[in-house]
Amino acid sequence: MTDLELQQLVATISMHDFHRPFQHRAYFNARLRTTGGRYQLASHDIDINPKMLTDFDEATLIGVIKHELCHYHLHLTKRGYRHRDADFKRLLAQVGGSRYAPAPKQATARPYRYIYECQRCGRRYYRKRRMDTRRYTCGRCQGPIKLV
């Protein structure tokens, strides 16, 4: 699904479920990591996490879109648009949006690039970042450390 198709889907859901037009931008934002979507108060745009489409089904995506549209329409009509507001909870239940987006699947942990070993006791240190072995010693025995 492209950003244009997402824009059309959001506009369709807005007219069908909220009976109001969506007049701003909706697009995928790959920088969203822990949330399904985001409504921006200043620009009124809606960002959607692309993982809601790739990792889950279309019903989940539509639930997230309805959630963000609740923020959008309530904010523009100057009513309670925050999660804790009764207006928000009422409208979300009325349109059948999702209260919570499912947690995106976590990427597999990157393997450690650097393995250091104490010359005296043999303890290993696994690091993602390089370190200056002349400045550091083993935390257990104070022996010198060497890159393996």
Curated annotation (Swiss-Prot):
Residues annotated to bind Zn(2+): H67, H71
Protein name per its UniProtKB record: Protein SprT-like
Cofactor section: Zn(2+)
All residue ranges annotated as the SprT-like domain in the record: 6-147
A Pfam family of this chain: SprT-like
Organism: Lactiplantibacillus plantarum (strain ATCC BAA-793 / NCIMB 8826 / WCFS1) (Lactobacillus plantarum)
GO process annotations (BP): response to stress
Subcellular location: Cytoplasm
